[in-house]
Curated annotation (Swiss-Prot):
Disulfide bonds: none annotated. This is Dynein regulatory complex protein 8. Residues 95-130 form the EF-hand domain. The keyword Cytoplasm applies. Keywords: Cell projection, Cilium, Cytoplasm, Cytoskeleton, Flagellum. Belongs to the DRC8 family.
Length: 166
């Protein structure tokens, strides 16, 4: 098998794994349309809002052709997401641990090892591509401890690229 075919098969396998995680009912081969962004991110990538909108638009168009309502089938998900991952590969990689650590340290000038969760929330909603309230709530569940602190060395490790290649 050629390297290109190997790569396409790896991408396809990753997309199928992500799809199965969010499958509406086991064996249904359907994912709720609202879960598509999370399922795409489960492939190990971080598309921008514009990229995600493009994916959702393509899936909606395919669903309109098949009369599917509220759900995305495996075949359509696989087709759109695989093509997207292969075409946009360079723009989708997650930052590595050291890059994330440097970014977090910029918000900790005193070197305490943590940043305040409320300050971090305001950064995420006020600059660049803002997170939705739902995304922010889910993120804070994982990021912040019970005292409202984000211990960024641990959190950077969780966010970092896990070494998988597209």
């Amino acid at each position: 098998m050629s390297k290109l075919n190997d790569k396409h098969e790896r991408v396809r396998a990753r997309v199928r794994e992500a799809f199965i995680l969010f499958e509406h009912k086991e064996g249904s081969r359907l994912v709720d349309f609202k879960d598509v962004p999370t399922a795409v991110r489960a492939c190990g990538v971080n598309p921008t809002a514009v990229q995600m909108t493009h994916i959702l638009d393509q899936l909606a168009a395919l669903n309109a052709e098949t009369d599917a309502t509220g759900y995305v089938g495996l075949e359509n998900f696989e087709l759109v997401v695989c093509n997207f991952l292969i075409q946009q590969e360079a723009s989708l990689f997650r930052d590595d641990y050291h890059t994330l650590l440097r970014a977090f340290r910029a918000f900790d000038p005193d070197g305490r090892g943590f940043i305040d969760a409320e300050s971090f929330k305001s950064l995420l909603t006020g600059k660049g591509e803002a997170l939705s309230e739902d995304e922010l709530a889910k993120m804070m569940t994982v990021a912040a401890d019970g005292e409202g602190k984000i211990w960024y060395e641990d959190y950077a490790q969780r966010l970092a690229n896990d070494g998988r290649t597209i």
